[in-house]
Amino acid sequence: MSRGFTLIEMVITIILLGIVGLFLGNIAGQAMGIYVDTTAREALIQQGRFLTERMSRELREAVPNSVMVANGCIEFLPIVNSAIYSELPSATGPFRLLPINKQVAQDERLVVLPRDAQALLGYPSPNAEQIAVITQSVVFDASNQLTMVDVPISAANPFSLQSPVRRVYLYRDPVAYCYISREQRIYRYQGYPLTRNKLAPDQFGSGVLMAENISRANFVVDVASLQRNGLIKIELTFAARGEEVRFDHNALIYNTP
C-alpha cells in the first residue's frame, strides 16, 4: 500500500532544497565574481600593453633630445627622414645631403646634433642653433638617386657644431600623449603647429583616446648623449572594479645625436 508525503516531510524537503539552493547560489555568485574580476583585470592589462607598445614604437623613432614632459603630457618629434652630409653649410645654404629616404619636402626642418627639445621648436627664433627650414622640395630621379643633392635651406644662425657621425635629422610636426587626470584617460595629439604656446592639452585641439581607467600616469626623460641613447620611463597605474594594474615600462630612443 503506498502513501504520499506527510506535511512534515514536505516542509523538511523544502527546507533542505532551499539550503542546497542557497549554497549552490553562493558558489555560483563567487564564481561569477571571480570571472568579472578576472575579466576586468585582463581588460586593464590589454589597455596597458597596447598603450606602452604604441608609445614605445613611436618614441624609438623620435629625433634625439626632442622629448619634453610637462603638465601630464609627453611630446616628441617623429623623424620623417635622415641624411648624411660632408660639410656644414652656411646659414643661407644650400646643404649638401644624401637622404636615406628619397624625398625632401619644403617646410620640413632639419637639425644637426640636436641638444635641446625647446630649441627644436624655435625656428625662426634668433636663438635657434643647428636648425634650418627647407625652402624648396627636392625632386629625385635616376640621375641623383645615389648621389648627394643640394637642399635649399634658410637658418637663423650658421651651423657651428659637427655631428660625430655627420648625420642630419628631418622633422615636421610634433606628437603628444597627455594624461587628463579628471577623466582618467590618455589622449594622443598630432597635427598641431610647432609654434604652440605651451605643452598642455588645451593647445592641441581634439585628441584620440588611447586608454582609460588610468588612476596615475608619469613620464620621465633620461636624455641622450653621444655615448648612449635616450630613455623614456613610462609609469602607468590602471584601476577599475577594485582591480589595479601597474606598468613600469622603459622606451628606448634608437637614434643618438
Q: Where are each of the predicted segments found?
A:
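N-terminal leader/signal peptides at the extreme start of proteins
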Residues: 1-3
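Aliphatic-rich helix starts adjacent to a transmembrane/signal segment
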Residues: 5-60
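Generic detector of short, locally flexible boundary/turn motifs and exposed helical patches
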Residues: 8-10, 17-21, 38-44, 143-144, ...
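Long, contiguous hydrophobic alpha-helical segments, chiefly transmembrane helices and signal peptides
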Residues: 27, 50-52, 59, 76, ...
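A generic secondary-structure signal marking the coil-to-beta-strand transition
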Residues: 31-33, 72, 230
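Generic, ordered loop/turn and secondary-structure boundary motif
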Residues: 36, 45, 169-171, 211, ...
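Extracytoplasmic beta-strand-rich oligomerization domains located immediately C-terminal to a leader/signal peptide
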Residues: 41-187
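Short linear sequence signals and composition-biased patches located at protein termini or domain-edge surfaces
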Residues: 183-257
